[in-house]
Amino acid sequence: MSKKGLKVGIASAAVIGAGAAVLQAKNKSEAKKAAEKTTVTSEPKNDYRNTERGKDKKNSKGIYYTNGNYEAFARPEKPEGVDEKSAYLVGSGLAALAAACFLVRDGQMKGDHIHILEAMDIAGGACDGIYDPTRGYIMRGGREMENHFECLWDLFHSIPSIETPGVSVLDEYYWLNKKDPNYSLCRATKNRGEDAHTDGKFNLSQKGCMEIMKLFMTRDEDLYDKTIEDVFDDEVFNSTFWLYWRTMFAFEDWHSALEMKLYFQRFIHHIGGLPDFSALKFTKYNQYESLILPMKKYLEDAGVDFQFNTEVTNVIFEINDGKKVAKAIECKVNGVEKGIVLTENDLVFVTNGSCTEGTIYGDQNHAPNGDAEVRTSGCWTLWKNIARQDPSFGHPEKFCSDIAKTNWESATITTLDEKIIPYITNICKRDPRTGKVVTGGIVSCMDSKWLMSWTINRQGQFKTQGKDKVCVWVYGLFTDVPGDFIKKPMKDCTGKEVTEEWQYHHGVRTEQVEDRVERSGVGVSIMVVYI
């Protein structure tokens, strides 16, 4: 045999030998798996059964999770020992008032055992809406509601209307939105009042869709400290979808990617109604009058104790072996320091990190100027004081340390005559004075340097509002950029100047803008620093 033939023979033998070894190993592996399978299947499963027992077992916080409406419609039995308990609620916004209402309705706690501690002289928190004789009508913002606000509707079906005897707030709200459903006829404009014809399209590329899906599927932990611009590129940012989304929810490119994901998860069921707001529902009046006042009356009728001009500065905790117990509340009542001693029979509810804390108000002739960082920041200071006691209480500085990136500005404009009405009607295709849906949500001026958006809800937005007046809510996403008509940043503008910029984007002739605003509208500009 030649050397070449010998090499081939040796190689063939080696391959055959290797193949036999692999086959032998494979057979052993399969035999092992079969034995394991036999062992597993032959063992009786006496310790396992299909059941839902224990599904409603309470967790370490004393609560359990459920779904459906079975438990929502049942009236709870009176909790044992509730007559010996008291509750202290810090703040009187929607969250605190809702907690108090549930304590009365479901917890069956005595009203005079519930104490609401509010730094201001009025309840409502961010759900505001008021007439200030020195400024005019003021709304800092508004809530966009939909049919899956289960907790809200559960609450308000129990809150009596303050307008219509014998019905609930939910009844009124439901009937109104059935008779006058919400939808927009013009979602965006360009070229000073022309319909941008977004026409319900998202204009997302396949790559843009995949970026959104990837964010949706990413673990929360992997999004900590990431911004939206870390996870999206121009495939998303140049889409009409991003125009809809960022203007509806006030998102900047540098905002939290995790917050963006959570918004996706919360509202994905209404993605089809995003372009024309047909998924949304609105109250008859501003949300202070439509939601807060009925809740406040319900609580007052139950004997709940409202303590206004009471600023809570700290909650002192005793921490032992991982157990945290609130022992005292430190507060200032009309500027005088006071302490409230707590026992384990006292419940404490704290609204921390309010986005409307430190609001700065302007008016027709003054910009909302002021250094928010050196102002008393109320519930942010409270959260910082609590967080110093234990790391598990969170990191408030993550949310309130860079107001250049968290500030946001809105304005309330009240028309004084008919001159601007035709321009409004031309855009939204509805007369704003009918008392019915007007814009159906925000109209975004997509080529505005401030990225200005504005909306007119059903008029009048205030019970005291004259029928000849229209209240408009306006906001700008970019507050530090000079405007198109007003050549200065929105944050430095008076209410009059914001109104001028708004009318400019309606197509009012430039030489008429200033005169029309002087005679035809009043604007109140509002800087909100922690959005």
Stretch-by-stretch model annotation:
Residues 126-129, 259, 359-364:
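Short, solvent-exposed loop/turn and secondary-structure capping segments
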Residues 4-87, 105-111:
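Extreme N-terminal leader/targeting segments of oxidoreductases
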